């Protein structure tokens, strides 16, 4: 406007509503949030074909994330039921990191976050025994599937106390006492909600098409 104020027309209002739906679930993994940003940018430029293609790719990416999260659960369930191999194994941190396939910094971070408590050898070295390595494999698999440290800690706490555990339920249901809850603390539920939102996003894109068509008649 001449006085410097922004003028919002019907299209802008619908675009803001669409953005609200797009960012309702803060899923960050695999560039999902970035894809939503690109979708909104495309709609802002009236590029409806690009926006529709991005939405399609977004659904495929979510499906892949859900599959990986579920696969991790199945692997962990089998590991929990299985027996520990190489009972007499004893490794130092660098050896354990190589054995598990992670960095020593990752191990240190997991220890600092309470996921693992280690014994020390007589000369003061941290020692990773067979049970520790099994635990580390569980952590690595779940972290690779993008579960949060808090969610993994819930599961490990259940295992430590020999409680009956439904792995999927524990990983995706934060305790009421947890102060801060992120989408990765309930990963599969968040991804499923994000996928449900795509139906609403498709409607939003169609509405924007109609509004744009009226504007440029």
Regions found by a protein language model. Name each.
Residues 2-92, 130-217:
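Arg/Lys-rich, alpha-helical DNA-contact motif
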Residues 86-107:
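Polyanion-binding surface elements
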Residues 1, 103-124:
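Major-groove DNA-recognition helix of helix-turn-helix-type DNA-binding domains
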């Amino acid at each position: 406007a001449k006085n410097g104020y922004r003028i919002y027309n019907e299209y802008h209002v619908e675009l803001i509503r669409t953005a609200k739906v797009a960012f309702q679930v803060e899923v960050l993994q695999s560039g999902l949030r970035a894809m939503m940003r690109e979708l909104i940018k495309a709609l802002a430029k009236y590029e409806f074909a690009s926006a529709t293609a991005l939405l399609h790719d977004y659904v495929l990416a979510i499906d892949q994330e859900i599959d990986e999260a579920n696969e991790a659960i199945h692997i962990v369930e089998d590991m929990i039921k299985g027996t520990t191999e190489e009972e007499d194994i004893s490794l130092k941190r660098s050896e354990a990191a190589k054995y598990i396939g992670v960095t020593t910094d990752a191990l240190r971070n997991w220890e600092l976050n309470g996921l693992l408590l280690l014994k020390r050898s007589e000369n003061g070295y941290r020692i990773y025994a067979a049970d520790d390595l099994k635990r580390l494999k569980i952590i690595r698999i779940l972290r690779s599937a993008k579960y949060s440290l808090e969610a993994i800690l819930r599961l490990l706490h259940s295992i430590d106390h020999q409680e009956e555990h439904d792995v999927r339920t524990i990983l995706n249901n934060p305790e009421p006492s947890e102060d801060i809850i992120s989408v990765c603390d309930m990963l599969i539920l968040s991804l499923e909600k994000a996928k449900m939102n795509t139906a609403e996003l498709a409607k939003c894109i169609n509405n924007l098409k109609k509004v744009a068509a009226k504007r440029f008649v």
